[in-house]
Amino acid sequence: MDPKRSQKETVLITGGGGYFGFRLGCALNQKGVHVILFDISSPAETIPEGIKFIQGDICHLSDIEKAFQDADITCVFHIASYGMSGREQLNRNLIEEVNIGGTDNILQACQRRRVPRLVYTSTFNVIFGGQVIRNGDESLPYLPLHLHPDHYSRTKSIAEKKVLEANGTPLDRGDGVLRTCALRPAGIYGPGEQRHLPRIVSYIEKGLFKFVYGDPRSLVEFVHVDNLVQAHILASEALRADKGHIASGQPYFISDGRPVNNFEFFRPLVEGLGYTFPSTRLPLTLVYCFAFLTEMVHFILGRLYNFQPFLTRTEVYKTGVTHYFSLEKAKKELGYKAQPFDLQEAVEWFKAHGHGRSSGSRDSECFIWDGLLVFLLIIAVLIWLPSSVILSL
């Protein structure tokens, strides 16, 4: 943002207590923008001077309206969502309340409070549902809702459509119109990331990372948190009149622009923490069957014990099936330029927080986890193999 203009900017970030929302807020604050973080949970890090945090539930319109009070908000970054991975993917009711109901509330509040710009954080998953996509672009149609393998992706697709369809909505009192756009990021990584990397490191430390799966030539994408911050700031600018409202009503794919095999991407993390990268490779369909089995077990037992599934079906697709997208539209219309990053920062972060292999540690726990993993894999194999093969054994 232009420093001279940014002095008059006030932005509200839903999901501002999370990893990415907080990083975005800090970056905007450094540019002189007045930042309001809105989230149900407070940030894990110390809130810098000049940033205001308001605790509230996006599912409650009254909470959102309180956050809008006493502030002439010029842009909302709607990042808050629920159900991205793990056991959260299986809580359909809360996923729908947050991702669809929360988005409806934000759109209503923007209209009432005469907010001129809204940037929505979407996902690759509105297009991808397990099919191979190579260098796809924004002209691709939405994946039909009934084909989504999880409710998170389905609700994010519905919410993105609502946001883009709201572009041009008249604001209250005839004070202009609402300009909206949506960014579709790849999987986020960076030092201190709180969702994906800690789960992966936990599996590594428990001895559960015993195999990889799928075609070794499969390619996926990731986006460093700082590249995603850059994209959101550029998108907010591209909704302004001095940029010709070029981003109005538009979706954009955002990534580092470097397709890579999922497991090779994480090799530096595994080896950097002192562990051995697995050499065993399993068929994708077998692992998908295993994921389906764990989801069924969670469905049956989840109310008694809400355990973390080892993998969900969507996670198998996301990590084992080729899908990557062109950045040309984001480059041309937003001026997006992905900077080069790797996992070294994350490795150092985990080491600084006490992670990394120490000889002889956790052996008994790893043995228990190994046994459980082998047991579930045997069941998955029995389900996966054709019945004629099983009967002949």
UniProtKB/Swiss-Prot annotation:
Binding-site positions, NAD(+): 156
Main location: membrane
Entry annotation: catalytic residues: 152 (proton acceptor)
Membrane topology term: Multi-pass membrane protein
A GO cellular component entry from the record: membrane
This protein's UniProt keywords: Membrane, NAD, Oxidoreductase, Transmembrane, Transmembrane helix
GO terms under biological process: steroid biosynthetic process
Matching InterPro entries: 3Beta_OHSteriod_DH/Estase (IPR002225), Lipid_A_modif_metabolic_enz (IPR050177), NAD(P)-bd_dom_sf (IPR036291)
Single GO molecular function: oxidoreductase activity, acting on the CH-OH group of donors, NAD or NADP as acceptor
Subcellular location: Membrane
Pfam families cross-referenced by the UniProt entry: 3Beta_HSD
EC id: 1.1.1.-
Transmembrane segments: 282-302, 371-391
Family: Belongs to the 3-beta-HSD family.
Listed name of the protein: Short-chain dehydrogenase/reductase family 42E member 1
